[in-house]
Design a protein with these regions (language model features):
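Residue-level signature of catalytic and energy-coupling elements of molecular machines
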Residues: 15, 74, 168, 203, ...
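Nucleotide/phosphate-binding catalytic cleft detector across ATP-hydrolyzing
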Residues: 1-12, 16-199, 218-220, 243-244, ...
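Extended, charge-rich low-complexity interaction segments
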Residues: 65, 205-215, 365-376
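A short acidic Gly-Thr/Ser loop motif
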Residues: 6-12, 77, 201-208, 214-217, ...
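Glycine-rich phosphate-binding/hydrolytic loop that grips phosphoryl groups
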Residues: 345-376
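A short, acidic, amphipathic alpha-helical segment used as a generic capping/interface helix at domain edges
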Residues: 298-309
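Glycine-rich phosphate-binding loops at beta-strand->alpha-helix junctions
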Residues: 258, 315-339
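A conserved active-site cap/scaffold subdomain adjacent to cofactor or substrate pockets
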Residues: 226-247
Length: 376
């Protein structure tokens, strides 16, 4: 089965074409990235230009994969989304649980409630309570006096989605699934055990940072905010008065969150912000790292506070996977361990995939994960 994923990001457009057998057998036929700056904060700057860029991306993907693209999974940014938890309970007088009991509990819940301004990107049962015993598998066949269902709902603005649907219509493409971007990243980077036992997956992207929490193979929390690796680049450019391209180079080659005594003595030559070829100044490596560290600290603290606000810190999840381009900053694993008091690793696309070496890179986690998504 051919599965196609499309990502409309703030800095790039991406398309992946796969021959999908199952989650353990995926052959990647094509992965393409086009630089683009036509989407900012979930707002399309120029619809016609974006339409043309996506059209060219699809055409080139068809050529590379030798496949006709008719339908797509779309990665959806969840900036300004709303996470909501709700529950429903019924009494069944120690009967054996049937499908009808579950349907009754669902029907009397908020599951089918309409929302005028928001679209339900995720609306799922995440746990069952049978007489105060929590289970995460289908309860049918068990006996109970009282059944309680716990739900998780992720809502996003309908206006943003309307543009996505219009884009697909104009390109004559069907949308199979809309996938929260952090969930895509988690699906491509987490092992089976990590998804079962509970893991916080953090994607440090170009313009956004996104979080997904997976536990008992369920997506139980998603969040995203407008701080990314480009903010680190901007901080460096302002902090040392250099060009953005020079700041990006400094971040990539010398950036670290963990300081070393030798940083004071490592001197780096950088151009002035004017960009004149013959005008340079010198800084030491510790200056760069003193700029990077507060931004990363702030970003990780925001994630942790958002998790606490949703009372998910009580789950005491001890696994954190950091992916996305920003995850390649030296020292981020060690620093995240201190923030989250957890095991931390850098997440790359899973190794069993048929990928060229350069795609086993955290920057590709979100687009590759779009083809892993399957509705229950």
């Amino acid at each position: 089965m051919i599965k196609v994923g499309l990502n409309l990001g703030n800095s790039k457009l991406s398309c992946i074409v796969t021959d999908y057998k199952n989650s353990d057998n995926i052959n990647i036929l094509s992965v393409l990235n086009y630089p683009s700056n036509l989407i900012k904060k979930n707002i399309i700057i120029n619809y016609e230009k974006l339409l043309n860029e996506v059209k060219n991306l699809i055409i080139e993907s068809e050529k590379q994969s030798q496949t006709k693209i008719n339908s797509i999974n779309v990665n959806i940014s969840i900036v300004d989304s709303l996470s909501k938890y709700y529950q429903s309970e019924i009494f069944i007088s120690d009967q054996q649980i049937t499908d009808l009991h579950l349907k009754k509990a669902i029907n009397q819940s908020e599951y089918f409630g309409e929302n005028e301004n928001n679209y339900e990107l995720i609306n799922d049962i995440i746990a069952y309570d049978l007489d105060k015993k929590i289970i995460h598998t289908d309860p049918i066949g068990n006996y109970a006096n009282k059944i309680k269902l716990y739900f998780y709902k992720l809502l996003i603005d309908k206006k943003y989605l309307k543009n996505i649907f219009n884009l697909a219509d104009d390109l004559k493409l069907n949308i199979d699934n809309l996938i929260p971007s952090p969930l895509s990243s988690a699906l491509s980077t987490l092992s089976k055990d990590e998804k079962s036992l509970g893991t916080i997956c953090i994607d440090l992207g170009h313009s956004t940072t996104s979080t997904a929490i997976i536990e008992n193979n369920k997506f139980i929390f998603g969040d995203s905010f407008l701080v990314g690796s480009s903010n680190v680049t901007n901080d460096i450019a302002r902090g040392v008065s250099t060009t953005l391209s020079s700041a990006e180079r400094l971040k990539t080659l010398y950036g670290s969150i963990i300081s070393s005594p030798s940083d004071e003595h490592e001197i780096i030559e950088i151009p002035f912000i004017s960009g004149e070829n013959d005008k340079f100044t010198q800084i030491n490596r510790s200056t760069i790292n003193s700029i990077i560290k507060p931004r990363i600290e702030e970003t990780l603290e925001i994630i942790w506070q958002n998790i606490k606000q949703n009372n998910l810190h009580n789950k005491k999840i001890k696994n954190v996977v950091i992916t996305g381009g920003g995850s390649q900053l030296e020292g981020i694993e060690e620093y995240a361990r201190m923030i989250f008091s957890s095991n931390v690793r850098i997440g790359k696309p899973l190794e069993f995939l048929n990928l060229k070496d350069n795609f086993y890179n955290p920057s590709y986690s979100d687009i590759i994960g779009t083809t892993f998504f399957e509705k229950d």
